[in-house]
Amino acid sequence: MAIFGEAETWVAIAFVILLGVFAYLGVHRTVLQALDKRRDRIKAELDEARKLKDEAAKLLADYRARRASAEREAQAIVDSAKADAERIAAEAKAKLEDFVARRTKTAESKIALAEAQALADVRAAAAEAAVAAASRILSESVKGNLADELLSKGIQEVRGKLN
């Protein structure tokens, strides 16, 4: 009975008795239930994590699709704006060229009119000078009715040729 004098033997006997008491009281069921509850809670958390991961993946895919769509739309807007700007610039250039052409034509018309008026004024002045010179020469050299007649004819002839 030396075996009962060993401390390890009593520890082993106490441990077996403790396990027997725990088995009698149903502690193993409580521990198993606690472990089952913990397993279920962990499983629920994992399921929730998977669900959140799937939602995050869907949101990421949606975000990427929206971003790509927004980039395409922005590029389309930029392209449209460039095309509009080029069209407006071309229209403005055409309008400016038309305006300059009309202004040039108007200026040329005014210059031609002024030249014609100046030429007419010079001709009129020359005609008046010629008439005055002819009148003086004829009045000094010819006297009487013949002078008046020649003077009238000469004046009419000079005016007709110069105008």
From Swiss-Prot:
Molecular function in Gene Ontology: proton-transporting ATP synthase activity, rotational mechanism; proton-transporting ATPase activity, rotational mechanism
Protein's recorded name: ATP synthase subunit b 1
Source organism: Rhodopseudomonas palustris (strain TIE-1)
Parts of the chain that traverse the membrane: 7-27
InterPro entries: ATP_synth_b/b'su_bac/chlpt, ATP_synthase_B_chain
Keywords: ATP synthesis, Cell inner membrane, Cell membrane, CF(0), Hydrogen ion transport, Ion transport, Membrane, Transmembrane, Transmembrane helix, Transport
Gene Ontology terms: cellular component: plasma membrane; proton-transporting ATP synthase complex
Lineage top rank: taxon: Bacteria
Family note: Belongs to the ATPase B chain family.
Mode of membrane association: Single-pass membrane protein
Matching HAMAP family: ATP_synth_b_bprime (MF_01398)
Main localization (coarse): membrane
Subunit structure: F-type ATPases have 2 components, F(1) - the catalytic core - and F(0) - the membrane proton channel. F(1) has five subunits: alpha(3), beta(3), gamma(1), delta(1), epsilon(1). F(0) has three main subunits: a(1), b(2) and c(10-14). The alpha and beta chains form an alternating ring which encloses part of the gamma chain. F(1) is attached to F(0) by a central stalk formed by the gamma and epsilon chains, while a peripheral stalk is formed by the delta and b chains.
Keyword check for Transferase: no
Protein's UniProt keywords contain Ion transport: yes
Subcellular location: Cell inner membrane
Job of this protein: F(1)F(0) ATP synthase produces ATP from ADP in the presence of a proton or sodium gradient. F-type ATPases consist of two structural domains, F(1) containing the extramembraneous catalytic core and F(0) containing the membrane proton channel, linked together by a central stalk and a peripheral stalk. During catalysis, ATP synthesis in the catalytic domain of F(1) is coupled via a rotary mechanism of the central stalk subunits to proton translocation. Component of the F(0) channel, it forms part of the peripheral stalk, linking F(1) to F(0).
